[in-house]
UniProtKB/Swiss-Prot annotation:
GO biological process, one term: maturation of SSU-rRNA
Organism this protein belongs to: Pelobacter propionicus (strain DSM 2379 / NBRC 103807 / OttBd1)
Protein family per UniProt: Belongs to the RbfA family.
Gene3D superfamilies the record matches: 3.30.300.20
GO cellular component: cytosol
Name the record gives this protein: Ribosome-binding factor A
Subunit and interaction comment: Monomer. Binds 30S ribosomal subunits, but not 50S ribosomal subunits or 70S ribosomes.
GN (gene name): rbfA
Length: 122
């Protein structure tokens, strides 16, 4: 990413995080945390990665709520950003945390089995 797209991504992250902390009038959006924002080089698209507390249905509902709030969020970004065209917003659930938790669980399981094997051989 260029310096310009990095700065724009940071501003989008801060602005939308602030809006979400105040709350949107959509009951589908649960407790959502933005994890990253990537803006393409031509500044036309911003991919916004988020996590949400709850099961798969809660995550899907939050994603649907965020997608339906795109227009409002772009208008709010327009009040803050000093660029001519506000990027299209694309919300994506960030699965990296779940992936990390799964790896951590597997490593703990391996360590437990290793400790059990050591105690049996002693």
């Amino acid at each position: 990413m260029s310096k310009r797209s990095e700065k724009l991504a940071e501003t989008i992250h801060e602005t939308i995080s602030s809006i979400l902390s105040r709350g949107l009038n959509d009951p589908r959006i649960g407790f959502v945390t933005l994890t990253a924002v990537d803006v393409v080089e031509d500044l036309s698209i911003a991919r916004i990665y988020f996590t949400a507390i709850g099961d798969r249905d809660a995550r899907k509902n939050s994603e649907a709520g965020l997608n339906s709030a795109k227009g409002y969020l772009r208008r709010e970004l327009g009040k803050v950003l000093t660029i001519r065209h506000i990027p299209e917003l694309i919300f994506k659930y960030d699965e990296s945390q779940e992936y990390g938790n799964r790896i951590d669980s597997i490593l703990r399981e391996i360590a437990t089995e290793h400790d059990r094997d050591d105690s049996e051989h002693s």
